[in-house]
Amino acid sequence: MKLSLSRRDFGLMAAQITVGAAGTTLFGLPSALAQQKSVNLGTFGGIDAQNYIRAKNSMAQTFGPGAKVDYVTVRAGSEVISAMAGGSLDMCNIGSSPMVVGYANGLAASMVYAYKSIIDSEALVVQNSSGIKTVGELKGKRIGLPFNTSVHFAALAALKGAGLGPGDVQLINMRADTIASAWTRRELDASYIWVPVIPRLVEDGGTIIFKTGDLATTQGLAMFDGFLVRDEFKKQNPDLVLAFLKDFDTIAREFKQNPKEVVATMTKFLSVDEAAVMRSLNTFYPISAKEQITSKWMGKPGEKDTGVAKTLKVQADFLKESGQISTVPKDVGAMVDSSFAMKLAA
């Protein structure tokens, strides 16, 4: 399958961890389920729940003795899609926009869980010196952001809500790690980006004028990152997928509710300061299994009129309009599989 998704060079770093623990796996799943299994888990390497799982090595218990876990570090949703297309990545959290791009290009993968609700972890920041106060005042201005990402979609949606289209502004495709320096050089009037870049821009003469969470009130869109799983892996290893999601559900609550433990773990694991960890904690909003299967989010298996399905369809339309995909999938909501969430919610 050919995917024209690259907005940055594909770079994956794999750290193999051979798991060895006796007895049964976490949540009482027999360790025999996981023996001789190989699982490639993606992580963006930042201060998030997925990397907290890696730091705690909780998968050693979840997958049991004999299981081999490879942690694959990715830098963007496009890398997740490319790695899954090549079979080198089985499960990873990903923004909903690149998820749609992958599905539209024939990637055989499913969203099995909403990783988090996006409220204030993504935002549109403007230079104070620009005098811009509203989204509608961005006409003709330079906006830096990484293309084929959730912030790309959010930016287009915010502009549309203000009566502007992509042609009314200068959208500049940039890696997240280059935006802060361009901002300092005043080469940008605005940027739509995520934490931890947001506070750096604010500290360097910026003001937030729009948050991705605002799309829920202005356009009725539930914004989220999701867990994507290769369909072949899901079919062959449903018990491992369920075990992983059970562990994530527990870790996500701990990540949010036990800041002292998270700070102690992540500052050591990533060599970052406490303030950086707290910024991520304060912008992370997990969704419980029972919430996942409501119509606001994924809904129950077979349910069509859901918040996730609506958001994916709107995103697909935006991606087609902006030339990021050639056709809109007939049923983009078909990529959602809430059967695992149903089992967790029972």
Where is each model-derived feature located?
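Sec/Tat-exported extracytoplasmic proteins
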Residues: 63, 88, 93, 103, ...
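Conserved C-terminal helix/tail region of periplasmic/extracytoplasmic solute-binding proteins
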Residues: 309-346
